[in-house]
Curated annotation (Swiss-Prot):
Subcellular location: Cytoplasm
GO cellular component, one term: cytoplasm
PROSITE patterns, A to Z: ADENYLATE_KINASE (PS00113)
Superkingdom to which the source organism belongs: Bacteria
GO MF annotations, alphabetized: adenylate kinase activity; ATP binding
Quaternary structure and interacting proteins, as annotated: Monomer.
Protein task: Catalyzes the reversible transfer of the terminal phosphate group between ATP and AMP. Plays an important role in cellular energy homeostasis and in adenine nucleotide metabolism.
Species per Swiss-Prot/TrEMBL record: Prochlorococcus marinus (strain SARG / CCMP1375 / SS120)
Residues that bind AMP: 33, 38, 59-61, 85-88, 92, 129, 140
Transmembrane segments: none
Free-text note on domains in this protein's UniProt record: Consists of three domains, a large central CORE domain and two small peripheral domains, NMPbind and LID, which undergo movements during catalysis. The LID domain closes over the site of phosphoryl transfer upon ATP binding. Assembling and dissambling the active center during each catalytic cycle provides an effective means to prevent ATP hydrolysis.
Catalytic activity: AMP + ATP = 2 ADP
Name of this protein: Adenylate kinase
Length: 182
């Protein structure tokens, strides 16, 4: 299995759940930008306070904030990692590619988890996060489609993109992911 992975997909697609399973199984570092940002928010850091205002509106946190958090983690860990939730747009992909080039850790495979908007909304409302409500979810899905979708073409052109269906049980989706990554 490849050991430098990137998971793409809309919010609520199960990226975090699947990333945790793959990382536990393979011993990889799981870098979830959403979790990293929530840690900053719960820690009450200056970055966390800025991020909270942005996240509560359903908007994306600035590239500079996110890349600096990711960089700190990757510099300390080079064995195997999975990025979940970053990059979300071509500008972030460029920043990430520059960072990974500097530390000689290029992405080996990008996995796109695809799923229907109605299922996504149900899943997100069921998570119980304070930044998940119907208006915020609708805005997040629109932002995803507008800004993140071009990444599919970007990584497809690089020959490192694989897509899987994210519907079904956690176990079924995990089996599809393992097959795609082998």
């Amino acid at each position: 299995m490849k050991n430098r992975l990137l998971f793409l997909g809309p919010p609520g697609a199960g990226k975090g759940t699947q990333a945790s399973l793959i990382c536990k199984d393979q011993g990889f570092l799981h870098l979830s930008t959403g979790d990293l940002l929530r840690e900053e928010v719960s820690g009450g850091t200056d970055l966390g306070k800025k991020a909270e205002l942005i996240m509560n509106k359903g908007e994306l946190v600035s590239d500079e904030i996110v890349i600096s958090i990711v960089e700190k983690r990757l510099i300390k860990y080079s064995e195997g990692w999975l990025l979940d939730g970053f990059p979300r747009n071509l500008a972030q992909a460029s920043l990430l590619q520059n960072l990974l080039g500097r530390i000689s850790q290029p992405i080996e495979i990008v996995l796109l988890i695809e799923i229907d908007d109605e299922i996504l909304t149900e899943r997100m409302l069921g998570r119980g996060r304070k930044d998940d409500n119907k208006a915020v979810i609708k805005n997040r899905l629109k932002i995803y489609k507008d800004q993140t979708s071009p990444l599919v073409d970007h990584y497809k052109k690089q020959g490192i993109l694989k897509s899987i269906n994210g519907c079904g049980s956690v176990e079924d989706v995990n089996s599809r992911i393992k097959e795609a990554l082998s």
